[in-house]
Amino acid sequence: MKSVYPMSSPSSAVFADQGLSGKANQTQPPPPLGLVVPASKPGAKKPLRKNAWQVAPNLLVSFRYAWAGVSYAFATQRNFRIHTFTGVAVITAASLLHLEAIAVAVLALTSCLVMILELLNTALESVVDLTVGQSYHELAKIAKDCAAGAVLLAAIAAVIVGGCLLLPPLLSLMV
């Protein structure tokens, strides 16, 4: 007799198989597609999280998972790297121009907002790709376009804020 005990979503279900003994032999759900290569192949990678469908056991592990997401975005997403380097350049310029702490904080927050939205965009694109696979769906396009639009609007706002806070001191240096 087989039964499925859903945890939070179909992809995070625990599958139990009760044999003649009546004891449940729990097996874990299959790993997400594209993350695991058979170990027999050279250069095979182990999954980042063996039990990815489980909640992190402690806060340190949660931080490690979060940092893995940031590292993944930095390694794979060109736009995330551009936003990161731009943010560092803006904060460096603000420090060199001796801007007030509140101005530096506003610049840091707007830069971080763009990077946060880029992380959310990457996550949403991954989930949409996992859901629709290689097929085209108009709703998938809308979801991806809206997420990219959110990043675009945040980037435009960051440029405006950066211009308002950095241009006056830069212009005063040129005069």
From Swiss-Prot:
Enumerate the GO terms in the molecular function aspect.
Answer: ATP binding; ATP-dependent diacylglycerol kinase activity; lipid kinase activity; metal ion binding
Compartments where found: Cell membrane
EC number(s) reported in the record:
2.7.1.107
| Cofactor field | Mg(2+)
InterPro entries to which the protein is assigned, alphabetical: DAGK (IPR000829), DAGK_sf (IPR036945), UDPK (IPR033717)
What is the purpose of this protein? Catalyzes the ATP-dependent phosphorylation of sn-l,2-diacylglycerol (DAG) to phosphatidic acid.
What is the similarity comment for this entry?
Answer: Belongs to the bacterial diacylglycerol kinase family.
- Provide the protein name: Diacylglycerol kinase
Q: Which organism is it from?
A: Synechocystis sp. (strain ATCC 27184 / PCC 6803 / Kazusa)
